[in-house]
Structures are given as structure tokens and as C-alpha cells.
Amino acid sequence: MADFYDTLGVNRNADADSLKRAYRRLARQYHPDINKEAGAEERFKEIGRAYEVLGDPEKRARYDQFGEAGLGGSAGMPDMGDMGGFADIFETFFSGFGGPGSSGARTQRRGPQQGDDLRYDLTIDFNQAVFGQEREIKIPHLETCDVCRGTGAKPGTGPTTCSTCGGAGQVRRATRTPFGSFTQVSDCPTCSGSGQVISDSCQSCGGQGVKQVRKKLRINIPAGVDTGTRLRVSGEGNAGPRGGPSGDLYVFLKVKSHARLKRDGLNIHSEVNVSYLQAILGDTIEVDTVDGPTTLQIPSGTQPSAVLILDNKGIPKLGNPVARGNHCISVNIKIPSRLTDDEKILLEKLAIYYSAKGPQNHHHNSGLFSRLFKSNAS
């Protein structure tokens, strides 16, 4: 006899929800009314036996300790009269079936229904994501036929009640299962669940009640969006069947990377190169930001890899564009690989000056100075 956990495809530590999900999935797959393959019915019974034990905490504890021997012959197909929460599972499975305790047919689908939602992927520039922009897009979607107004019937005519289902949109058939007799409810094959048939179709839409058209839309992209941001455009999805309301359009954004700027949440990061003299003496330079060229103060004594902050020059907060992040600028100090004779003389004098100030400054040929005093020879 197969292990009950293996039968359900779960590990021995599986919780009640995992067991229930596994059982529902397998019961759907192997139900005799759905799966006509040889052995499906026997497999269905094994699945039922496994869940009947593992779904009961007391029986599961005995099974975990003693195996099937600890069940005392109690493991078997569940009794419909003593199923407890087990019956709820079957009510979920067979929402299209009627049977003991069943409420019967599903909600009918006659009349207008809402149309499907649509997805549109839009790529935008870095600065467009920062500050927002209005963009024009073209989408193909279904619109209600303006000739038949969604009925699908030729003007002057109309749909008639389906003779197969009597307008219910559903048909039933009795089915016997290991759990007793059930009434399976399915869409009517004649009217496809609408409860109505069209004898004389609209020539404009071919009886569909909808037509595919390409439509121009102007999309407002708010400031602060990022890759993965989803914008909802109400009522711009597909038109619903039989004159039903349209679904929605969802625009998914992808933001192009910037050549020099990098986004990190609400902050922007970039780098700037300065000379060793600018780092030592300080300077005022101009840097690129999303707001355009901006003045940046380089403090005297700036160290390599120092990060200077431009407040409120980052990304606006989505939904509250007044609040912005910062622009963080990493400073790269460039050491010249070649010096002119005049530069070398001046720096040598500076090195001598520092050497005279104390022993700690004596080894001027190492570190910064060793990099400055490279030979000018080619």
C-alpha cells in the first residue's frame, strides 16, 4: 500500500492547508467524470482514502506513529453522511454539480457581462519616469458594435430564446460517482451559455456584438514611477459581451537606464571626476542632474570616494511629488600620470616643506607623492 503522504504528493510536515490544496488538485485531475483513462477511478479512491486519514488530526497522528496498522481498519472512502468539513471540499470541487446538499445550478450568465481587462507594456525614458509625462499610445481592443449595439443580431431583428436550454444557458446530466449521484451542470452547447441564439447575424460584427479597433489614448504618467509600476485606465479594456461594460486597461511601465545617473529608491547616484588640486584646495563645479546642470561645491580636503549630497535633487515620491530624494555624487580624484617640469618643481618644493615639518612627513616618495612624481619619460 502506498504511503498516504506520497499519494497526495506532500511531505510529512505538510499543514492542513497544504493537504487540502493537494487533495483538491488531485481529485479534480482523477475524478472519473473528468479523467477517462484506465486506472483513474482507482487512483481517485486512493486519493480519497489518503485525505480521509491525513485530513483528520487524530487519524493522522495514529498513522504517523503506527502506519495503517494504527487505523484499525477505519481508513476507507469517506461516508457522505459523516464528512464534516470534507463535504465543503467537494462543494468547492463540484461547483458545477448538483447532488446531496447541493444548491443546484450555477449563476446563469445571460445578459450583459463585463469585458476582459487588457495589458499594455510601455517603455519610457529615465527623465519621463522622474517627472512624469503625458504619452499617446495606440491599443487594439474590442468595442461594442455600433450597428447592432452589442446584440449581435441584424438591425430590426433580435436574439431568440435557446430551445436547447429554454433560455437557462445551462444543461444538466445525471452522473453516478463513488460518492453517489450528482447532477452535472454545464454551459449549453447551442447558445454557449447565453440562453439566446441569433438567427440573422449582424453583418458588421459577424454576430459577435463587438469589433476590434485600434484606439488612440493619452496616458498620464505620474512623477516618480519605476519599472514595474502599473497604471490603470478605467473602461479602456475589451467591451463586454451582449453590450456589457468594458474592462480596464493596465499599462505596465519599463524605465530605460540613464547613461550617467543610477536610481536607488528615491535617491539618484552618479560620479564626478576632480583633479587632486581641486580636492585639496576645494572648488565649485557644475554637474548634471535630472533638473539640469547644477552647481556642486567641492570642499577643500575632499577625500577619494567621498560622497557629496545635493538635497531634494532625487526622485519625486509617487503620489506626493513635492517630497523628493537626494542626488548622491561620488568623487573620483584623478592623479596625473605625467607632470610638466614646472609642476614637478612646485610639488617637490611642497614635499620638502612637508618633510621639514616633521618625521611623519619625511617619506614623501611614497603614497600620493610617489604617484605624482612619476617619470615624464615616455
From Swiss-Prot:
Its cofactor is Zn(2+). The keyword Zinc-finger applies. Disulfide bonds: none annotated. Zn(2+) 1 binds at residues 145, 148, 202, 205. It comes from the Bacteria. One of its GO terms (cellular component) is cytoplasm. CXXCXGXG motif repeats lie at residues 145-152, 162-169, 188-195, 202-209. GO terms for biological process: chaperone cofactor-dependent protein refolding; DNA replication; protein refolding; response to heat. A zinc finger (CR-type) spans 132-214. SMART domains: DnaJ. PROSITE patterns: DNAJ_1, DNAJ_2, ZF_CR. Keywords: Chaperone, Cytoplasm, DNA replication, Metal-binding, Repeat, Stress response, Zinc, Zinc-finger. GO terms for molecular function: ATP binding; heat shock protein binding; unfolded protein binding; zinc ion binding. Zn(2+) 2 binds at residues 162, 165, 188, 191. The keyword Repeat applies. Binds 2 Zn(2+) ions per monomer. It is found in: Cytoplasm. Residues 3-67 form the J domain. Its main location: cytoplasm. Participates actively in the response to hyperosmotic and heat shock by preventing the aggregation of stress-denatured proteins and by disaggregating proteins, also in an autonomous, DnaK-independent fashion. Unfolded proteins bind initially to DnaJ; upon interaction with the DnaJ-bound protein, DnaK hydrolyzes its bound ATP, resulting in the formation of a stable complex. GrpE releases ADP from DnaK; ATP binding to DnaK triggers the release of the substrate protein, thus completing the reaction cycle. PANTHER family: CHAPERONE PROTEIN DNAJ A6, CHLOROPLASTIC, DNAJ HOMOLOG 1, MITOCHONDRIAL-RELATED. Homodimer. The J domain is necessary and sufficient to stimulate DnaK ATPase activity. Zinc center 1 plays an important role in the autonomous, DnaK-independent chaperone activity of DnaJ. Zinc center 2 is essential for interaction with DnaK and for DnaJ activity. Belongs to the DnaJ family. This is Chaperone protein DnaJ. It comes from Prochlorococcus marinus (strain SARG / CCMP1375 / SS120).
